[in-house]
Amino acid sequence: MTSEQAGSRQLKHDDDAEHKSPQQTTKWRNNAHSAARGRSCVRAATDLRFSTTKSSSEQNSPTCRAGLQASGTLLRLSSVGDVGGYARRRQGRATVVPDVKVRKMRLAGAGLTFISQSAVPEVRAAPVAKARNAALDRTRTFLTLVVLFHHAVIPYTYFGHTDPKSFVGFDMVVLATDSFFMAMFFLLSGLFVWPGLVRKGPRHYLLDRVLRLGLPFAIGALTIIPVAYYALSLRQQPEVGFADFWWKTVTVGPWPSGPIWFLWVLFGLDVIASLVYVISPKALDPINHLSLQAREQPAKFVLVMFAVTAVLYIPGRIYFGAGNWFEFGPFSVQHGRVLLYACYFFFGAGIGVANLNGGLLAADGRLAKGNWIWIPTVLIPYCCMWGLVYIKREILENPVQLPHWYEGIYGFFFAWFSMAIVFGILAFFLRFERAGRSILDAMQPDAFGMFLIHYPIVLWLQYWMFDLELPAIAKALIAFGLTVLLSWGATILLRKIPGAKHVL
């Protein structure tokens, strides 16, 4: 419309107003002024300078809401006129989607639609359900199955077997699994630490961890673990009853913790992370920035993490050795791996500080697209570790105390292999995140419970098969298959107990 046309229309409206009653004239002029103010708000909302160009009263006016509706940019206006609310920036634009149907009214002569305040006093954003990360869920469930398989084959390894039957292939499995799976659990656990601290605060976060980690550890140490190790005791002292064995375990010792040592170590790292968060909430931002860059350059992140883990792990292995454990009652952990686990945990926490799905672990990132490169990256250090095992057994004659040079070289390849296979597994599951349904999806809610209760099941199955004339492979597969089914079924039943889902 030209300025001349606008002036003619205004004169016509003024002439019409002369023939109206004073009340009609006032109403007409209010509508005209409202239309002008609405158009002003349209322009302000379009260039996203709304909060600075309009006063609080103007921002809350129905006509400004009309301007926002007409411009296609709908913002939630709070009672004090602030436009923060549910507006969120996505690629430089503020967007929000209303979750209510509203009654529309049309301004006479203005051609603008606005939201009636009598119909809806405030536009609310639809709550967005937190979507689970299928790739990480499947990775965690897969790792749980790796733990079960690891424990199912240990008695049937060629070196150090406890069953009459053995198979050297299981030594190859155990060498690989023992080198990475617990470190990877700490990495995955760390991913969600910072979001939990931000959402709940350190106090409530730690209370939640006491429920999720401390309570299962206490119950497991007093019940699950003694039941599991009683199967081993019967082979050596069949005359000892379970009550006597249990009492001796918890009073005199030794009191092994089995695989649940992971729970108390993880809780300890959660406590440290909470203290770090209180002191400096941005302490892990450098790791997060590195993760965001790793969306396109994952090699940089992997190399930095490898360098840090190697520096922290190798000295501990040289000083303590590979088989030295800290033990205090049911609290136990390998001395030489404490810093390795802490490193994985805090790197995971750094990745999860912000944009978890937009950095290193992005489903469309470079890590997810480079699966094949991980095969040689994993095989090279693994073969070198086997070469060192040969040197230890055939040349050094398997000494109790290995020379420092040996531990240092082995520690280097151990850190390399652990890093490579962890990110290789992550790359695989990220690549096939959308590849339909998987049995891992069905197992995912019960994976933690399976981890907690599988140990007595697998040890008692091995006890009952000890005297059977079956090949080692058959025994291991039977033990693994039944352990998966029985621990899964038991977890499903236990989770039906009121309140159990908060723990299992």
Place the predicted regions along the sequence by residue.
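Low-complexity, intrinsically disordered or signal/transmembrane-proximal segments
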Residues: Q5, Q10-H13, H19, Q23-Q24, ...
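Polybasic, low-complexity intrinsically disordered segments
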Residues: E4, R49-F50, S55
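Residue-identity detector for glycine
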Residues: G7, G38, G67, G72, ...
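Alpha-helical transmembrane segments and their immediate juxtamembrane cytosolic regions
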Residues: R103-R106, G111-L504
